[in-house]
């Protein structure tokens, strides 16, 4: 078994600490109670960024306020509800026939001749 240097062991232990703990240990951070509002603000900003990415129709190059982002999200949810509330289109005037594999991808269908080579 190899002996570990004390410096390397300390380095590995420090790397495992969270950023907040490391900042407090170095003395440049504030108390956890003082940092909590900042981390909540970062979390909220991250959430608004994710909403902006996920909702279609939000322009990429323009700056939107948080209220505008929320309004676009609400509009998108309402649009989805309308689409889901519409009745599904019914089958055509004939009987409903299941789709066969041969209709989807005929090249995947194995004939009896080819099947005999498999065994």
Swiss-Prot record:
InterPro entries in UniProt: bHLH_dom, DNA-bd_prot-inh, HLH_DNA-bd_sf
Signal peptide interval: none
Listed GO CC annotations: cytoplasm; nucleus
Keywords associated with the record: Biological rhythms, Myogenesis, Nucleus, Repressor, Transcription, Transcription regulation
Subcellular location as annotated: Nucleus
Domain of life: Eukaryota
Keyword Methyltransferase included in the entry's annotation: no
Domain bHLH residue range list: 28-80
Family matches, as SUPFAM superfamilies: HLH, helix-loop-helix DNA-binding domain
GO molecular function terms noted in the UniProt entry: bHLH transcription factor binding; leptomycin B binding; protein dimerization activity; protein domain specific binding; transcription corepressor activity; transcription regulator inhibitor activity
Stored Pfam families: HLH
Chief location bin: nucleus
GO-annotated biological processes: cellular response to leptomycin B; central nervous system development; circadian rhythm; epithelial cell differentiation; heart development; metanephros development; muscle organ development; negative regulation of DNA-templated transcription
Assembly and interaction partners: Homodimer, and heterodimer with other HLH proteins. Interacts with COPS5 and COPS7A. Interacts with IFI204. Interacts with GATA4 and NKX2-5. Interacts with ANKRD2; both proteins cooperate in myoblast differentiation. Interacts with CLOCK and BMAL1.
Functional summary from the UniProt entry: Transcriptional regulator (lacking a basic DNA binding domain) which negatively regulates the basic helix-loop-helix (bHLH) transcription factors by forming heterodimers and inhibiting their DNA binding and transcriptional activity. Implicated in regulating a variety of cellular processes, including cellular growth, senescence, differentiation, apoptosis, angiogenesis, and neoplastic transformation. Involved in myogenesis by inhibiting skeletal muscle and cardiac myocyte differentiation and promoting muscle precursor cells proliferation.
Protein name in the entry: DNA-binding protein inhibitor ID-3
Organism from which the protein derives: Bos taurus (Bovine)
Gene: ID3
